[in-house]
Structure formats: C-alpha cells, structure tokens
Amino acid sequence: KAKMPRFKKFLSDSTGVVPRTIWHYDDAGHTQEATQTLRQVVDEEDLATPKPRRVIEKRLQLASNKNSIILDSFAGSGTTAHAVLKLNATDGGNRRFILCEMMDYAETITAERVRRVMNGYGEGTKAVAGLGGGFDYYTVGEPLFLPDKNLNESVGAAAIRAYVAYTESIP
C-alpha cells in the first residue's frame, strides 16, 4: 500500500486566536460584570441577563474579521455594539453592526448605550472616553398583521396592496 505525504500543521505555527472549549470568567466576563457595565453606561439594571461585553469580543475575535458586519437580532442592552466598538478601537478594525430590538427599551437603553459608548460616559475619575463611531436608529412601522392573524387595516390600503403585490410575485 502506497503512503501519501501529508502536511502537518503545528499549533505553534498558527496565527490569531485559538479557540478553547472553556472560557473562564476572568477572560470572558460574567453576568454580574455585565450588569455593572450596563449600570455605569446607562444607569439601568432592570434587564434580566445582559451579556458580558468581553464574551462577545472573544466570539468576534474567533468568528469575524476586521471588516465584518455583525448582526444581533436580539440586541437587548446593546452589548454586541459595545463589543464591536471596543474591538475596533483595540485592533483598528472596521467592523459594523446591525442591531434589532423590538422591546420598548430599544431607544432608551439599547440606542442610548451605543451613543454613550461612542461619545463617552461617566464623570470625574469614573469618566470613560468615547470609542467613536456612528449609527442610524430606525423605527419600524405598525405590523401588517394583528395578533389574531387578520390584516391590520390601520396601516392603509397602499401598504396592504404592496404586500399582496410582493407575495404574489414570489415564485
């Protein structure tokens, strides 16, 4: 039986971050730290379980590059945006983020946290310099369908016609 030569790659030759199966809290943070950070930035602690910024940073280091677009469809307190901005400031990256949040705190907590992280927050010895950047905030209109699955007539005939035209043109 003929033997085939194989390329052997050693861990010491690898570049970048090598993932480990366990992330200790001193590397990745914990929920108490996440709650403290949220309180420092927007003076809010009512969110049940904010994610630690450092754990999101570690995920981004492993699964993205410096020009990635990061989507967080359950943005909560805005931790993902905070992590993206912090990582960009650290490594000179140009990552961008898209956050989606449907709860009523989207503007008062999520967007406000992002604004403060970009512009700076705190006072005196507790002042934290802004990380820079910018973002756009959008509000989606009324839902086309009501919870009972009927059409929401208050959106107007034009929106309903556009929806019908769109769905009828899908093959």
Predicted stretch roles:
Residues 5, 11, 76-77, 130-136, ...:
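A glycine-rich phosphate-binding loop feature that marks nucleotide/adenosyl-phosphate handling sites
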Residues 25, 102, 142:
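Residues immediately flanking
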Residues 49, 56-125:
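Conserved S-adenosyl-L-methionine
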Residues 114-171:
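SAM-dependent methyltransferase catalytic region
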